[in-house]
Each structure stands twice: as structure tokens, then as C-alpha cells.
Amino acid sequence: MDSASQDINLNSPNKGVLSDFMTDVPVDPGVVHRTPVVEGLTEGEEEELRAELAKVEEEIVTLRQVLAAKERHCGELKRRLGLSTLGELKQNLSRSWHDVQVSTAYVKTSEKLGEWNEKVTQSDLYKKTQETLSQAGQKTSAALSTMGSAISRKLGDMSSYSIRHSISMPVMRNSATFKSFEDRVGTIKSKVVGGRENGSDNLPPSPGSGDQTLPDHAPF
């Protein structure tokens, strides 16, 4: 029996032979850390792609560093020119909105919405609904106009009556007819009052009064 197939019994005197043999075997680091070849690619193609990936990642890092330097320089220029952050924000928003408007998705969405709007406005249901709403609006406007005219006319009549009444009272009192009527009423009143004051002298004596005098002491 060779050393590779020895008994691994812990009580065996040869228990350390296998481990010592495995420790002495050299191991290739490239074989251990190497990933399997991607399906559909040869080993040469994989190496080429990995080299290109490393190059692109290095370029990205360089571009980020350049971009950071450019942004710092841009901020310094804006600070020296006195440009505010609010103005920069407005400019960025305007630029972003312009980019959205010229984007393919926005253009397609606008065209689609335009087509839907045209289809809806040309449909019979939309036309009937629009006519119904238009008629209802006209009737409502006419009713409000009629009510407003009636209220205005009523207020005008009340105002005219009040003005005529306030104007006609002094004129009526100063008219000759009204004065003549007042004179007649005053004459009748004076006659009635004067007759009451002189009533005892003008009244005729009662029959049987004559010269008869009442006795001083009437018998009981």
C-alpha cells in the first residue's frame, strides 16, 4: 500500500505521512485564482477582453480626475464673476428641461398625446358633450342676465318712487289747492271751537224754567 492510500487511523504510527506528502506538493497560484473560461470565448479572447477592461477602467479614473479639476476651476470662475447659486440652479433646470424636450421619449409622448387629443375631439361623444355644455352655459347666462335686469329695474322703480315722493310732498303743500283745503279745515275748526265756548249763551231756555225758583229747603 502506497502513502496516498494509507490508513488515516489516529493510532497508526504513519498518521503524519500523508499530510507531509501533501505539504511538499508545489501549488501554482495562477491555477488556484484563475476563473473558468467564459462559455463561448477562447482563453486568448478572454485575456484580450480583460486587458481592454482594465484599460477602460483606468481611463474612467483619469476622466473623473480631469472632471473634478474642471469643476473646481469652473466654480472658481463663477465665484470671481459673482454668479449666484440660484442663477446656476435656474440655468441647470432650464438646460435639463431643454434636454427633456428634445429627447426622443418626450417627442414620441407629445406626438402620441396629440393623436389622442385629435381622436377625442373628433369623436361624436365629445361633440355632443361640448354642445350640451355650450347650451347649458347659454341658458345659465340668459337666466342670470334676466334676473339681473329684473333686480335692476326693481331697484330703479323703488329709487324713482322715493325721489318722486320726497319731491312731491313740499310741492303739494305749497300748492293752491292744498292751501285752500287747509283754510277750509281751519275755518270749520274755529267755528266748532267758538260754538262750544259760547254754547251757554246761545242755547235757548228749557221749557218750564221761567221764573220758578227752587225752594231753599225741600221738605223731606
UniProtKB/Swiss-Prot annotation:
Keyword Coiled coil: yes
Chain positions found as N-acetylmethionine: 1
Keyword Coiled coil: yes
Positions of modified residues (Phosphothreonine): 177, 187
Segments forming a coiled coil: 40-82
Domain of life according to the entry: Eukaryota
GO CC term, one of those recorded: cytoplasm
InterPro entries to which the protein is assigned, alphabetical: TPD52
Alphabetical UniProt keywords: Acetylation, Coiled coil, Phosphoprotein
Residues carrying Phosphoserine: 3, 12, 19, 96, 149, 168, 175, 180, 206, 209
Region of interest called Disordered, as start-end residue ranges on this chain: 189-220
Annotated family: Belongs to the TPD52 family.
Assembly and oligomerization: Forms a homodimer or heterodimer with other members of the family. Interacts with MAL2.
Name the UniProt record assigns to this protein: Tumor protein D54
Phylogenetic classification of the source organism: Eukaryota, Metazoa, Chordata, Craniata, Vertebrata
